A protein has these predicted regions:
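Short, well-formed alpha-helical segments that are part of the catalytic scaffolds
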Residues: 33-46
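Acidic donor-binding segment of Leloir-type glycosyltransferases
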Residues: 45-78
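Glycine-rich, basic loop-to-helix element that forms the pyrophosphate-binding segment
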Residues: 79-98
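Short beta-strand-to-loop acidic/aromatic patch adjacent to the donor-nucleotide binding site
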Residues: 102-113
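Short beta-strand-to-loop element that shapes/binds the nucleotide-sugar donor at the catalytic cleft/hinge
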Residues: 141-152
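A recurrent flexible, glycine/aromatic-enriched loop bordering the glycosyltransferase active site
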Residues: 161-179
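A short, conserved alpha-helix in the catalytic core of glycosyltransferases
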Residues: 183, 187-188, 193-220
Length: 324
C-alpha cells in the first residue's frame, strides 16, 4: 500500500458553503473510475466544505482521480490490488481513524455523486445525531437504508417527511455513510474476504450486533427513493458508467455471498428463499454470462468459497466523457 501526502501548492476547487465539522475525515473508495471519483472529491471540497487535508482517496488497484492537481491536494492511499469494496472500505476506515482526534469517517462510493443527494449534509446529520437522547449509541448514519422483512428479503426505507430526521434501519449500501469511531473501537471492520456483494450488509449487521444503532438520514433517503428502484438506478447511472445488467460478473457474488450472510445473520429459511429467488434471476437474466455466474456463485456459496474470483471482476469502470 502506498500513500501520497498532500502537497502545499495544489489548489482544488474552493468550497461554496460553510466548512465541514472538525473531527471528520471523508474517504472515497474508487476502482477504475477516475472521473466519477474526481467528481465526488470536488463535491466534498466545494459542497460539503471539507479541507483537502480532511479528504482521503483509497484507490483499489487500478484508477485514481482525473486531475493530477486534485490528487496532489488530498491524501492518496493506493492498494496494490483490487480488494473489492470489502477491502477498500476496510482500508478507508483504517486511514480515516489514524488521527486520534477524528471521531467520524464519511465513507463515499466513487459513483455516489450520480444519485444527487442533498448537500451539504455532513454537518446537518452530525448535529441531528448530537440531539438524540442516546447519541453515544450511534454507530453509523447512512444515506439510504433497508430493513429485513423475513427470510433475508429487504425493503427500502423511505421515512415520512413529518417524522424524525434520523430513523433506524437494519442494513444499507455504502453510498455516503458516516461511521463513528465507536464502531472500530468495538472491533467492527468490513470483512475483506467478502470482496464484493453483501459485504456492506454484513458490516452493518455486525455494527448492530456490537450494540450500536444504524440510522438513515431521512432527507437523503427521500431524495434517493427513485434511485433505489432498478429502473431509477439504471437511469441515474447509464450515461456515466455501465449499469448493473452490463456487468454480469456481479451475479456471481450476489449468488455466492448470500450464503455467509444467511449463516451469520439469518437462518436456513433465508437460504431457501435465496435459492428460489436465484432461480428467478437465472430465468430473467439478459444473457448466458449472467446465468452461468449465478449458478457458479450458488455452487461456490454452498461450498463456502470466499474472496475474489479472477473470472468475475470489473473491466470497465466508467464511460468515456465527451471532450470539454
Amino acid at each position: 500500500m502506498s500513500v501520497a501526502v498532500p502537497s502545499e501548492g495544489a489548489s482544488p476547487r474552493r468550497r461554496s458553503g460553510p466548512a465541514a465539522p472538525e473531527g471528520v475525515t471523508a474517504v472515497v473508495v474508487t476502482h477504475r473510475r477516475p472521473g466519477l471519483a474526481g467528481d465526488v472529491v470536488r463535491s466534498l471540497l466545494a459542497d460539503e466544505g471539507f479541507a483537502p487535508e480532511q479528504v482521503v482517496v483509497v484507490v483499489n488497484g487500478a484508477g485514481g482521480l482525473d486531475d493530477p492537481e486534485l490528487e496532489s491536494a488530498v491524501r492518496m492511499v493506493r492498494l496494490p490490488t483490487n480488494s473489492g469494496p470489502a477491502g477498500g472500505f476496510r482500508a478507508a476506515l483504517a486511514a480515516a481513524f489514524e488521527e486520534p482526534t477524528v471521531g467520524w469517517a464519511y465513507l463515499c462510493e466513487d459513483d455516489v455523486g450520480l444519485f444527487d443527494l442533498p448537500t451539504p449534509r455532513v454537518a446537518r446529520v452530525l448535529a441531528e445525531v448530537e440531539r438524540l437522547d442516546d447519541a453515544s449509541g450511534t454507530g453509523a448514519v447512512v444515506a439510504y437504508g433497508r430493513r429485513f422483512v423475513g427470510r433475508g428479503h429487504t425493503v427500502n426505507v423511505v421515512p415520512d417527511p413529518a417524522g424524525p430526521p434520523l430513523v433506524p434501519v437494519d442494513v444499507a449500501a455504502w453510498g455516503a455513510t458516516l461511521v463513528s469511531r465507536r464502531v472500530i473501537d468495538r472491533g467492527v471492520l468490513p470483512a475483506a474476504e467478502w470482496f464484493f456483494g453483501y459485504e456492506d450488509f454484513d458490516f452493518f449487521c455486525r455494527v448492530r450486533a456490537a450494540g450500536l444503532t444504524v440510522l438513515v438520514d431521512s432527507a437523503s433517503a427521500r431524495a434517493a427513493e427513485v434511485v433505489q428502484t432498478d429502473q431509477g438506478r439504471d437511469a441515474a447511472l447509464a450515461q456515466a458508467r455501465p449499469i448493473d445488467a452490463d456487468e454480469p460478473w456481479r451475479a456471481y457474488y450476489v449468488a455466492r455471498n448470500f450464503f455467509p450472510l444467511a449463516r451469520a445473520h439469518g437462518s436456513a429459511n433465508w437460504l431457501g428463499w435465496h435459492l428460489a429467488y436465484s432461480a428467478r434471476r437465472v430465468q430473467r437474466a439478459r444473457g448466458r454470462a449472467a446465468r452461468v455466474a449465478t449458478l457458479h456463485g450458488l455452487v461456490d456459496g454452498a461450498r463456502g468459497r470466499m474472496g475474489v474470483h479472477p473470472r468475475y471482476v470489473r473491466t470497465t469502470g466508467e464511460r468515456p466523457r465527451p471532450p470539454d
